[in-house]
Curated annotation (Swiss-Prot):
One of its GO terms (cellular component) is FNIP-folliculin RagC/D GAP. PANTHER family: FOLLICULIN (PTHR31441:SF2), FOLLICULIN FAMILY MEMBER (PTHR31441). Coiled coil: none annotated. It comes from Schizosaccharomyces pombe (strain 972 / ATCC 24843). This is Folliculin-like protein bhd1. Belongs to the folliculin family. Residues 65-75, 99-115 have a biased composition (Polar residues).
Amino acid sequence: MDVVFALGHFCEAEGPSIIFCTQKLHRSTVSKFFEHPTSKRSIGVTENGNDSPEAFKNELDNRNNADSQSLQSSTESLFKADSEDYLCKKVSKGPESPRVNSFHNSYSRNQSPISRKSSCVTCSTVLPLEFSVPDVQPRLYTNSSTNPDVLYMSSQHPHTQQRYSTLKRLMVRCLSCEYSTLSEASDSMSNPLFFGDQDNGYVISQSFSLRDPSARGGLRRYAIIATCPNQLDLILRYSFISEKFLHIVQFLRISSFNTKNDYSSSRSKTTASSSNGTFASPSFNISSLSGSSNIGTAPSYEISSSIGANVSSLAHTQRLPSFSFLRRRDDIGEGRSLVDITCWDGIFVGLHSSFSWILEVWDLLVV
């Protein structure tokens, strides 16, 4: 079974990007990550600094028992999104996402794609302090309850270059050219979509939008996908997967809606201006161009026959207005991660437990 669950979004700076993915791996495969220098201080490394494969396996067992209750509660919170009382108890204000360096400065051929760093806040995976290690890419592990040699790992990117490239292409299609009709539940969510081919695999996709005042149009577009090279495996589980995707999306939408007003009231936005041009505010209109400092008085473009001037001479003498408000925003990098949008610092822990649970019962879903 080569199934990957992933969450992506359309980044204003990088385009369609992968934020989070969960995959089923064997322990022998996971131990290879510690061959890379950037992976030695992982969440699976033992407290005494011993990073051998045997010590790593023992530490995984110990930490899995300690974190099982928190992961289980996170799974229930995503699959019970219609309970507003539960949200009021579980959703807490998370810290603003820290800035991260671009992966172009730290990536090398010897590193796995899992060690890449996102270049913006909106594409980053932010974990609670108890699940994170400083200077190490966020990763989560869950042991399989049926097979001791299998575990489920979540990270921002898959662990192999081939799987990363394939997942990247599928995410680009989900957020650019593959569209479905709008869902009856909400205008900001489409119906589940199934597509794929033999080369890149097959996908069940659920695209949706979340309220984010810092995004263009006040909405940020996301997509949850389940990809598998076997078309029949996804078709047999289409109803179950699409139902669980709907529950996750409902939870995320309720969380972002409840925190939208709090964010709008705490952050005051002003009209950005620079010497190179004028940038528009939401109340900006075309008539205000005449009062702009870099335009002066609005010129007249009417041609009078009594003057005797031709169009070519006026084109050189008259100064056209600078429609610089149509230019790209300078604050494009000032986005918010999914943690800030939902105001829940454990949102990626909940996604990990939800995707891991689906992978755990994958073989039991065939009717």
